[in-house]
C-alpha cells in the first residue's frame, strides 16, 4: 500500500513524435503539487524508432506490437533505473492505436516488467477504462493543469495550450474545490498543430521541422485554403472532443500547389486559427494562454496565436513550469490519484459519462508471488 500524505512519484511520457522518453518526479498527494523533482530524457535510437513506426496503427496480437512493447519497456527500464526515491511510477507507454468508439486504445508496454525492475508499484494503461466507458481517453493532463494553476496561486481561470502534433486546450478554474468538480475543467483538442508543418518540411526539404518558423515567416497565408480548412466538421463540434494526428490528412494536399514558404505560412496559420476557434468555447475569458509542447519554440506560430486569439500567449515557463516535462509530471500526479481512488477524467475533459479513475496498478510484491 502507498503510504499516506505526499509521496515522490515518477512519471513518464513518450509522445507521437517518437523522439524518446521524458521522465520526471513530482512530490504530490494526488491533489496538491508540493515540489518538482529530477527530470531526465532518453532518446530513441533510429533502430528503436523504426520498430515503433512499424507498429503504429496496429493492435495486440500482431508481431510488430510485441516488438514495440519490448523496445518501450527496455527503454523505460533503462531510463527510470537512474532515478532514486520514487515511491510509485506512472507509466504512459507508447500509443500505437487510438480509436474511441471503435476498437479502443492501446499503449505499448506493460507496467509489470517495470514494477519488477524498479521494485515499486507502477500505474499504467491510463486510457482504456475511459474509452471503454464511452470517453475519448484523452486528454488526461487537465487535472494536472488544475493542480499547476493552484500551485501557482492563480485566482482566476487559466488556460493551457499544448502544441504537439495536435493542439489541445485546457481551461481551468482553480477556485473550484477539485478538478473533477463541475465548472473546474474543460479540455479538448483544437486541431492540427505541428504535425502538418513537420510533415511538409520532411516531404519537401528533408527537415524535421520549421526551425524558429523561419520558412513560414517568408511566406504569405493562402486565405482560400485556410477558409476551406476551417469549414471542416470538426470545428462545428462542441467540446470535449479529440482528434487523431491524421484526421486532417487532406491538409497537406491542399497546399501542394503553394511555394514552400507559402505552404509553411498557411499551415502555421491553420494551427493558430484552430486554437482561436477552440478558445471561443472557454466558459469565461482568460488573460493568458500558457503554452507547452514543441510549438512554443516557434515565434511565428506564437505571434499568429496572439493575433488570432486576442489573448496574450506565453511559454509555460513564465508560470514556473517545465514545458518539456509537463506531461511526464502529469502521469506522476495521475499515478498517485489512481492509487488513492481519485478520478483521472471527467465529462468535461474526455466526454466520459461520469467521473472516472483509470489506470491499472502492478505491484512488485504481487508479481513475486506469481508462479
UniProtKB/Swiss-Prot annotation:
E.C. code? 2.7.1.170
* Superkingdom of the organism of origin: Bacteria
Q: Where does ATP bind?
A: 15-22
Q: Does the keyword Nucleotide-binding apply?
A: yes
Keyword line: ATP-binding, Carbohydrate metabolism, Kinase, Nucleotide-binding, Transferase
Write out the GO biological process terms: 1,6-anhydro-N-acetyl-beta-muramic acid catabolic process; amino sugar metabolic process; peptidoglycan turnover
> What pathway, per the record?
Amino-sugar metabolism; 1,6-anhydro-N-acetylmuramate degradation; Cell wall biogenesis; peptidoglycan recycling
Among Gene3D superfamilies, the record links this protein to: 3.30.420.40
Question: Which Pfam family is an annotated match for this chain, by its short name?
Answer: AnmK
Q: What class of enzyme is it?
A: transferase
Reactions listed under catalytic activity: 1,6-anhydro-N-acetyl-beta-muramate + ATP + H2O = N-acetyl-D-muramate 6-phosphate + ADP + H(+)
Which GO-annotated molecular functions does the record name? ATP binding; kinase activity; phosphotransferase activity, alcohol group as acceptor
Write down the PANTHER family for this protein, in alphabetical order: ANHYDRO-N-ACETYLMURAMIC ACID KINASE
Physiological role: Catalyzes the specific phosphorylation of 1,6-anhydro-N-acetylmuramic acid (anhMurNAc) with the simultaneous cleavage of the 1,6-anhydro ring, generating MurNAc-6-P. Is required for the utilization of anhMurNAc either imported from the medium or derived from its own cell wall murein, and thus plays a role in cell wall recycling.
In Swiss-Prot or TrEMBL terms, this protein is called Anhydro-N-acetylmuramic acid kinase
Gene that produces this protein:
anmK
